[in-house]
Amino acid sequence: MMEAKPKRRIVTENGDTGEDLVLATLIGNGDDVGPLVRHAFEMGRPEPLVHQLKNVARKKEAEIEDLCKTHYEEFIVAVDELRGVLVDAEELKSDLASDNFRLQEVGSALLVKLEELLESYAVKKNVTEAIKMSKICVQALELCVKCNSYISEGQFYHALKTMDLIEKSYLKLIPLKVLKLVIERRIPVIKTHIEKKVCSQFNEWLVHIRSSSKNIGQTAIGLTASARQREEEMLERQRRAEEQNTGGLGELAYTLDVEDSEQDSVLKFDLTPLYRAYHIHTILGVPERFRDYYYENRLLQLQSDLQITYTQPFVESYQTFLAQVAGYFIVEDRVIRTAGDFLLADQVETMWETAISKIVAILENQFARMDSPTHLLLVKDYVTLLGTTLRQYGYEVGPVLDALDKSRDKYHELLLEECRKQIVTAITEDTYQQMVIKKEADYENNVLSFNLQTSDIMPAFTYIAPFSSMVPDVCRIIRSYIKGSVDYLSYGVNTNFFSVLRKYLDKILIDVLNEVILETISNNSIGVSQAMQIAANISFLEKASDYFLRHAAQLCGIPSRSVERPQASLAAKVVLKTSRDAAYLALLNVVNTKLDEFMKLTENVNWTTEEMPQGPHEYINEVVIYLETVMSTAQQILPMDALYKVGVGAIEHISNSIVSTFLSDSIKRFNANAVSAINHDLRVIENFADERYHSSGLNEIYKEGSFRSYLVEARQLINLLSSSQPENFMNPVIRERNYNTLDYKKVATICEKFKDSADGIFGSLANRNTKLTAKKKSMDMLKKRLKEFN
């Protein structure tokens, strides 16, 4: 065996230099000596290096020689062994040659069989490949047949999925170029056919959904109307509860709320054709084209829906028009909520803005044409239902409500004009007779319902009301006006519209009712009973104005206690009070005119009679009878303050008439007998005034202003003319006590006309009467002093 290689030893011979040792070490370690050689040549001193290399070579040769001497026996053994190996190799070679020959003989036959087998394998492979190709073709053709079947059955989604499978999984594998080419050419054609077919079905759906939009809109608006009715009923119950509980929660706000789920469950319409068409176009890779197609066609439909015909009155077509628009946008809302990203919100917003501007323009135009408040209200109600319905779907309906608000004044003008005609009819056809109520139901309808009762106790029937039938008739008209106004103002821009309603209520009471009453009052043909009944009616209408305000507050959902404060009353109440005073004045004018007809002092009195009168004139009885009739009637229907005004006015007019007659130019002179006769007449009137003042109960109310006190001027004048010392008039103390109402100039004028009978034909006989002479002197003195005073 070979021994292990001994470690390398470096022998240092005598004479070796340090450089030789370094070089020897580098070579022994197998290091690269190239840099050392290069350095030596670069320095121009290669000889020392060559010398060193030779020394190293000699050392190596010496080492080899020593190695051979040490292992020569081992070398010999190795050579012998190598010779034995060569002999064995020759024998092995001979055996291999023999075996190879025999193998060649046997393998020739097997090789022929192998070639046949390989040929069979090749045939099998070709057949297998052919079968595989055939299967691919058959499968592709079967898919084509299935695709055709789907198309014929209208199952376009499955047809497209089948074509997609053919394209992705089979088309590249089809070995037959002809078949592959045919399929490649037919696929686009089939896709185009499917797209056209789907578009055709979608167009049919567009026509159908447009024709269905009216029913959809009507159903949705009907649901909103039902919800509004339920809401109003709930508010009414809430209002009654609040009225009964004065410690309630105050004013509450309510909003109409209709659940979308309820509407969605009722509003059933099929969007499947739309979904299918969009899905198929998405599979075809052209979803954007279909979205544009849908948007353009729906926009055209909307523009067509927004066209109204002028051959049919708008009041007959507005529901169809508005329901069609409502249905259109309900469909669009369902599409945008259920079809994913098919429809953009901006597109729907554009369509809505188009619709809203057109609707507003149509409404403003049609409202301007309307001349019936009923028609305008019908349209307004339906428009607010439309707004409430579409607001639930997120549409901004403010502009539509603004259009309604702009027509508010137009509606109320029409309503006022309609109510004016009704009020004129009610007042014109009034009999001005106290209303006779025979049944409790009539009492409730005509009195209690308007708070016109004068007592909280139910009267006995038959009941004679202090007002005529005009009052409840007018109250019903005003109540219907309030209802009509509330109906228009409800569900509009302003939820708190009571202040607006209050303004319109004042308007009808002042500009319509009050004007008609004043026109009636100014009519010269009215009689005393008419004027008196009108005054009484105004008093009750003034009282009813509080009911009107409470009723308006009730309809607005405002607690009645908030309008029961004095400062909350209507301005019309003050105006009606003024008109009531005008009615009293008209009544007094009629009474005074009639009194003038009865009295006619210049005709009924002999101002220069020579006979001493024994009693009052006959005309004074007619005056008293007339006054009795007037006061009795007034006491039945007029309030106490009005009764007092009528009595005072009539009595004062009689007093003024007496004084005016003495001042009249038609009376040139009068004597003491005439004064005595007038004195008798005046006493009758004074007695009547006292009796009526006390019997009517006015003495308990007006303690310091009796009827007699309004005859004081006439009484003081008669007393002065009857006085034995008339010159005392010029005495300030006496005048202040007895004649304080008489005017100097009037007294002077009247006294100038006073001619005692002593100045007559038989005056010489009268001179014998000392009293008459003294009175005459006193009168002459008064005349003189009055002239001086004047």
Swiss-Prot record:
One of its GO terms (biological process) is vesicle tethering involved in exocytosis. Pfam families: EXOC6_Sec15_N (PF20651), Sec15_C (PF04091). Its main location: cytoplasm. Keywords: Coiled coil, Cytoplasm, Exocytosis, Transport. Residues 49-70 form a coiled coil. One of its GO terms (cellular component) is exocyst. The exocyst complex is composed of SEC3, SEC5, SEC6, SEC8, SEC10, EXO70A1 and EXO84B. Component of the exocyst complex involved in the docking of exocytic vesicles with fusion sites on the plasma membrane during regulated or polarized secretion. Involved in polarized cell growth and organ morphogenesis. During cytokinesis, involved in cell plate initiation, cell plate maturation and formation of new primary cell wall. This is Exocyst complex component SEC15A. It comes from Arabidopsis thaliana. The lineage of its organism: Eukaryota, Viridiplantae, Streptophyta, Embryophyta, Tracheophyta.
